[in-house]
Amino acid sequence: MSDGETAVIQSLAPGPIDGVSYPLKMVYCGQCSMPPEYCDYSGQTDVCRAWATQNAPELLEGLEISDEPAADGDEKKKQKRGGKGSKTGAAAAQAAASGGKKKGGGPQKVTLQREPRGKKSVTVIKGLATFDIDLKVASKLFAQKFACGSSVTGADEIVIQGDVKDDLLDLIPEKWKQVTDEQIDDLGDKKR
């Protein structure tokens, strides 16, 4: 500092700052729920820009939301990864086109089978999709009902941890009236 200058020290003590009106009003994007200056990182920049133009044009002043799509590396990260038993490409398109129905228009059947997995066993259910039953909902119901793990592993297959075949023979017709007792086949135990 030179001889004639005086330093202005602003207090960093907690409390209100002069010239600022309280409570502070925060504005968030109605599409990505981030502050507007972060809309560029949401992956929905075009939708965020349209929302801001319509609802809060004053937010666009001084902001630069880029028009460029995400880079190839970012795009690959955003793609949903298929897990075990998931279909990709032509197989997924064919399953969607057929509506999950079995080929050939054969009789509608639900099959139950116990499979050994190491020292324990799992129950495999096939054929529920032929009755227009949502497999994710059914899997969640089985997991809650039997207090065990249950997952959709294929286009028309649910795997439940544990041997619950006998309980399923009663539960399926009770929960889904379109499936009768005669349409459920117990295939027994699968050999190793």
Curated annotation (Swiss-Prot):
InterPro entries, sorted: DENR/SUI1_TIF, DENR_C, DENR_eukaryotes, DENR_N, SUI1, SUI1_dom_sf
Name by which UniProt lists this protein: Density-regulated protein homolog
CDD domains: DENR_C
Region (Disordered) location: 62-116
The organism's place on the tree of life at top rank: Eukaryota
SUPFAM superfamilies: eIF1-like
GO MF annotation list: translation initiation factor activity
Native organism: Caenorhabditis elegans
Coiled-coil positions: none
Domain called SUI1: residue spans: 117-176
